[in-house]
């Protein structure tokens, strides 16, 4: 592919759009230091490159990154039936699913959230899953009391939204939360 140098004016997205003498949008490029002090040069984006030639058993349906207590990056991925971690030295997806696997339907996907040293995942069809990123061996059930389509954290709580439990079945407008700083405690209490 040939590279063509085209003289463009300066990149001035902070000026008003009307009668702006410079560029207000620049696609497929990244900014870098220019040849003179205070100037910016736009460089083309690097092309995509193969990072790993391994794959999951089916289409990826979610991924997450995290960090263990030693500062090592952790990469997790999910498909319909398995949860994986990416081994940094070999760049190979390793199956670390619970025994029995998972049953993610075609309309669902995996959603992840980091809580302390835990990486927590949910797909609504199976129990929420957790893995301690410091140990990093195998995912296990976070709880069997509630399932959720959406997951997040807020001030020491793990929240599940669009829930399913044995008391009320599927309730798309309900949010359930764990105990304070206890992501594995999902005991229902009328007081909360």
Task: Locate predicted features.
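A broadly used, surface-exposed interaction patch
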Residues: 86-113
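A short local loop/turn or secondary-structure capping micro-motif enriched for an aromatic residue
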Residues: 94, 103, 129, 168-169
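N-terminal beta-propeller domains
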Residues: 1-93, 147-192
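Hydrophobic or amphipathic alpha-helical targeting/insertion segments
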Residues: 107-151
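A short beta-strand motif characteristic of beta-propeller blades
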Residues: 48-55, 93-102, 137-142
């Amino acid at each position: 592919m040939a590279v063509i140098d085209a003289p463009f004016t300066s990149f001035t997205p902070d000026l008003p759009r009307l009668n702006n003498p410079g560029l207000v949008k620049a696609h497929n490029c990244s900014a870098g230091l220019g040849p003179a002090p205070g100037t910016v040069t736009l460089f083309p984006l690097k092309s995509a490159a193969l990072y790993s030639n391994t794959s999951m058993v089916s289409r990826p349906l979610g991924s997450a990154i995290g960090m263990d207590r030693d500062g090592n990056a952790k990469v997790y991925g999910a498909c319909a039936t398995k949860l994986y971690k990416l081994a940094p030295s070999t760049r190979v997806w390793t199956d670390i699913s619970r025994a029995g696997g998972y049953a993610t339907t075609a309309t669902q996907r995996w959603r992840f959230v980091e809580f302390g040293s835990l990486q927590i995942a949910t797909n609504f069809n199976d129990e929420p899953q957790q893995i301690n990123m410091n140990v990093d061996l195998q995912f296990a059930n976070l709880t069997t009391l509630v399932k959720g389509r959406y997951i997040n954290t807020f001030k020491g709580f793990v929240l599940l939204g669009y829930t399913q439990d044995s008391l009320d079945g599927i309730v798309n407008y309900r949010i359930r939360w764990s105990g304070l700083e206890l992501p594995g405690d999902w005991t229902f209490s009328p007081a909360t």
